[in-house]
Regions:
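Membrane-embedded alpha-helical bundles that constitute the cytochrome b-like, heme-associated redox core
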Residues: 1-252
């Protein structure tokens, strides 16, 4: 096994189901890669980022929708931090966070056509995930302290004063266009490359949760996380955000 491989084992071998015609079913030719909570997190984050972006242009002086989307993103980010500890095998940080050197080595192998497939995130993809999570975290934190100086303001803008809150608002906007959209574009380009050039159905896998049976570096099949634990993580995340804003912010 590759020295960068993770140590978890599959919960089972691919199910050998047969159709009436004797042919192996589609499910028998695939294995579990991503559990439901992880997939819901990803697509919910995409939807909320898009909502925050689009709603920033609404004729809404208080930016109600924009702020609601921002709170939702913050809840998801805290949830993902918890899920990265208590979630399914491919969602845990311990299984995909690697050093920049490991990511660079993987990219060299990829360029040479010698990179082996990963069931979860490969070393470069793992760093991209961390970059996106950190980038979104900075974006939301900037929004909490932002103010347009008129009607729209984050809940903590009063802590830093109008002048600083105005500067933060400018950074908040610039960060989105130069960092968030840049990372998102790189992420999309990488997904399209794997999907259509490497023939690795990673986009479909993030919808169905399953990948084709292959000799993956990081295990044959992923172990799904508990839905009950996912629910608890989400409630804790929502409670932290609501409590922080209610206790220390000017408004929810």
């Amino acid at each position: 096994m590759n020295k960068h491989a993770t140590t978890y084992e599959p919960i089972s071998k691919p199910t050998k189901e047969r159709q009436g015609s004797g042919r192996t079913s589609t499910k028998a030719r695939t294995v579990r890669a991503w559990d439901l909570p992880t997939r819901l997190f990803k697509w919910s984050l995409v939807a909320l980022i898009a909502t925050a972006w689009i709603s920033s242009g609404f004729a809404d002086p208080d930016m109600t929708v924009h702020k609601a989307a921002g709170y939702g993103i913050l809840v998801l980010l805290i949830y993902r931090l918890l899920w990265g500890i208590f979630g399914g095998s491919t969602a845990r940080f311990s299984t995909f966070v690697r050093s920049p050197a490991s990511a660079w080595f993987y990219l060299r192998l990829l360029r040479q056509g010698r990179a082996k497939p990963y069931l979860g995130h490969n070393p470069a993809g793992g760093l991209m995930v961390i970059g996106l999570l950190l980038g979104c975290s900075v974006q939301v934190l900037l929004g909490l302290f932002s103010s347009d100086g008129v009607t729209a303001a984050g809940p903590f803008a009063g802590m830093v004063g109008d002048t600083v809150a105005g500067w933060v608002a400018e950074i908040h906007a610039a960060w989105f266009y130069f960092v968030i959209l840049g990372l998102a574009g790189l992420h999309i380009a990488a997904n399209l490359y794997y999907q259509f050039v490497k023939r690795d159905n990673i986009i479909g896998a993030m919808i169905t949760g399953r990948k084709d049976v292959r000799p993956y570096v990081d295990g044959r099949e992923a172990q799904g996380g508990s839905l009950a634990v996912a629910g608890i993580c989400l409630l804790v995340a929502a409670g932290v955000v609501y409590g922080a804003v209610a206790l220390f912010g000017s408004s929810v």
